[in-house]
């Protein structure tokens, strides 16, 4: 079902003000659709601007259908990255074999990549004139009443909204305030990873290289005169760390990969010198419901599938459309729309999350024998 402009009068009640926390893919997509449904949209983002940086975003068949509805398909097509070739490499930097996939893997009709910042800009441009954006601020408290939900912001200001959407990522503040502590919903998958992007080509442009050791995974992805360095390691137990302490995270990566083979010493130097660094545990967010009262979660905040799914940005875009379709279907009845969103979209997210968990078993082999078998089917 498609959200249509004429649905606006039917969906927007007396209080048409909605607040979206987070201005990345989930937030921008939700802002787009809620505006189309006739709501007055405010987006609050803790950063001083859009959250730039990060690896390219995959646009597959399902996401392609959504961006067509948003009028972004042609622009994404025009900005897609060239198809890459990939190979597994040995410790001596010789090729171990091409990247292959199991024979039963479905081949999508559309399988594009686009730079994250490019897609972010396209989505922001699509909604920037139809929503109010408040940067360098965040939600500090929520106070729901029968008629609305009061929001206290970090700067001390207060305002009431009809609905609040948490589109603020795996460490969602909205989820913590409304649904409880993160630990209830985080499922650790036994790995940690870092992403660093350097403005130079460490391998041939348009190629990907993967190197494995037992319990270790390294990927180089080269495009547009830059290279993504992805370092991932297995851990049976969770490592205590502060997700806001970058120095601590850099130390963890350095210690985990010290003394490893291939080009890892060189790559660690690149990571150390770079200002681009992201680290987190590989986890999934699993919740029985993504809605509570006047609050709903979209994207990683509600159903993060982990980077192993290869569709974090896409899943957020698809999820925002699923929520909007539920609003349109039920003509703005929030209770029914939220129920529909939970019931209809849960099976999809569960399938994506299961696939991501299976991918990790192949990407990060636990034994030397697993490394060799992974050379055949990464």
What are these regions (language model features)?
Residues 19, 42, 132, 228-230:
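A structural signal for isolated positions on well-ordered beta-strands in alpha/beta enzyme cores
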Residues 49-65:
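Conserved N-terminal glycine-rich FAD pyrophosphate-binding loop of Rossmann-like flavoproteins
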Residues 200-206, 238, 263, 288:
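Short helix-loop capping/hinge motifs at secondary-structure junctions, enriched
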């Amino acid at each position: 079902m498609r959200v249509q402009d004429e649905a606006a009068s039917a969906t927007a009640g007396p209080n048409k003000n909605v607040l979206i926390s987070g201005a990345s893919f989930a937030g921008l997509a939700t802002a787009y659709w809620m505006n189309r449904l006739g709501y007055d949209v405010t987006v609050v983002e803790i950063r001083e601007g859009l959250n730039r940086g990060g690896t390219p975003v995959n646009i597959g068949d399902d996401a392609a259908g959504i961006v067509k509805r948003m009028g972004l398909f042609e622009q994404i097509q025009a900005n897609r990255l060239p198809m890459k070739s990939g190979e597994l490499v040995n410790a001596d930097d010789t090729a171990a074999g091409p990247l292959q996939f199991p024979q039963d893997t479905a081949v999508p009709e559309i399988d594009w990549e686009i730079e994250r910042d490019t897609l972010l800009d396209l989505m922001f441009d699509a909604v920037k004139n139809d929503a109010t954006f408040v940067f360098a601020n965040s939600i500090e408290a929520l106070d729901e009443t029968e008629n609305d939900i009061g929001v206290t912001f970090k700067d001390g200001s207060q305002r009431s909204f009809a609905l609040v959407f948490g589109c603020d990522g795996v460490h969602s503040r909205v989820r913590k305030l409304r649904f409880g502590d993160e630990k209830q919903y985080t499922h650790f998958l036994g790995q940690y990873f870092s992403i660093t992007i350097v403005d130079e080509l460490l391998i041939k442009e348009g190629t990907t290289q993967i190197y494995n050791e037992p319990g270790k995974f390294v990927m180089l992805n080269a495009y547009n005169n830059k290279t993504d360095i992805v370092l991932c390691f297995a851990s049976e137990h969770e490592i205590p760390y502060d997700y806001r302490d970058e120095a601590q995270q850099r130390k963890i990566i350095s210690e985990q990969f010290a003394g490893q083979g291939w080009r890892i010493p060189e790559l660690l130097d690149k990571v150390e010198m770079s200002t681009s660094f992201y680290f987190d545990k590989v986890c999934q967010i699993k919740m029985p419901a993504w809605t509570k009262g006047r609050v709903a979660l979209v994207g990683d905040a509600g159903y993060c599938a982990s980077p192993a799914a290869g569709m974090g940005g896409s899943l957020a875009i698809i999820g925002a459309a699923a929520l909007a379709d539920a609003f349109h279907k039920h003509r703005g009845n929030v209770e029914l729309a939220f129920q529909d969103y939970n019931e209809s979209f849960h099976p999809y997210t569960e399938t994506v999350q299961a696939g991501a968990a299976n991918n990790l078993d192949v990407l990060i082999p636990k034994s030397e024998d697993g490394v060799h078998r992974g050379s055949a089917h990464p």
